[in-house]
Amino acid sequence: MYSEKGTHSIEVCFSPLSWPLYEKPNALVIVTDIFRASTAICAAFHNEVKSIIPVAEISESEAYKQKGYIVAGERDGKNLDCADFGNSPFNFLDPALKGKTVVMNTTNGTQAIKAASQAGNQVIIGAFINLSAVCRFAMEQEKDVLVFCAGWKNRFSMEDSLFAGATVEQLVVASKGKFHTTCDSAVAAADLWLMAKGNLLGYIEKAAHRHRLKKMCLDDVLEFCLTFDFTSALPVLENGKLVDQRTLK
C-alpha cells in the first residue's frame, strides 16, 4: 500500500498519545472509535438527531444535565450517573431522539474528538457503518487526510486500526492516484486490513476490546459496529457540535 504517487497524503495516528506528533492544520481529520462511540454517533445522525455535543469531563455532562439536556455517557463501559443512557449505537436509534440534541461523553471517543477540535482541523466522524460516505467526502475535499484512532485509554486498538486500514485502502486505491502514503502506520493499518477483511467478524475475536465488551455483556453491538455502509450520514464538527453534513447543503 506504500505509494509516493498522489496529490494528497493519508496518515494514521494510532493513539491519542501520538496526536501531538501529527500537526497538520490543513488536513481533514477522521476520528474513529468503532467500539462504540463513532458508530453510535453515526447511528444517531442516521436517526436524524439534531446535533451531538461531545464533552470530555464528567463535570461537563453533569452541568448539561442540570440544564435539561439529554446526556449519553460512560466510563469503562458503565453508564455515568448523570446519563440517560450509555454509548451503545442501539440507544441512539431510539425514534424519540429524532430532532434532539444529545450531550455525549465517553472513555475514548469524545476525548479524541476534543483533542482533534483543539488543533483547528476540519473534523469528521468515521465508522464502518458510514465508510463510503467518509471516503467520498475525503476525496471531495482536496486535502491531506489523517485518521485519528481513539484507541483504548491511549493504547493501540485493533478495531480502530482496521477501520483506518480500510480507509487507507479506499483512498489510495479507489481514488486512482489522488492520495498517496509514505506513513508507516498507514501502511501497517492497510496491511492489517488486508489480512482481516475477508472475515472481519472472525478476525475481531482477537481484539482485546471485543473481550472487554463481552465481559460486561455489551457485545450485542459487535456485528452492527462491523457492518458496512448502514448509513450515508456524515457527522462533522461545527462550532463545538457534531451535525450531519447532509443537512448543511
Where are these regions (language model features)?
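Active/ligand-binding-proximal structured segments within catalytic/core domains
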Residues: 28-40
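Active-site C-terminal subdomain of aminotransferase-like
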Residues: 128, 133-135
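N- or domain-start disorder-to-order transition segments that initiate the globular core
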Residues: 1-10
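Structural motif
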Residues: 10-11, 27-30, 50-53, 68-71, ...
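Long, charged alpha-helical interface segments
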Residues: 84-122, 136, 141, 158-249
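Residues that scaffold, gate, or flank divalent-cation-dependent active/transport sites
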Residues: 12-23, 37-49, 55, 59-102, ...
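Short, structured patches in soluble enzyme cores that scaffold and shape functional sites
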Residues: 106-108, 127-128, 147-151
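Phosphate/ribose-phosphate-bearing ligand recognition and processing surfaces
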Residues: 150-160
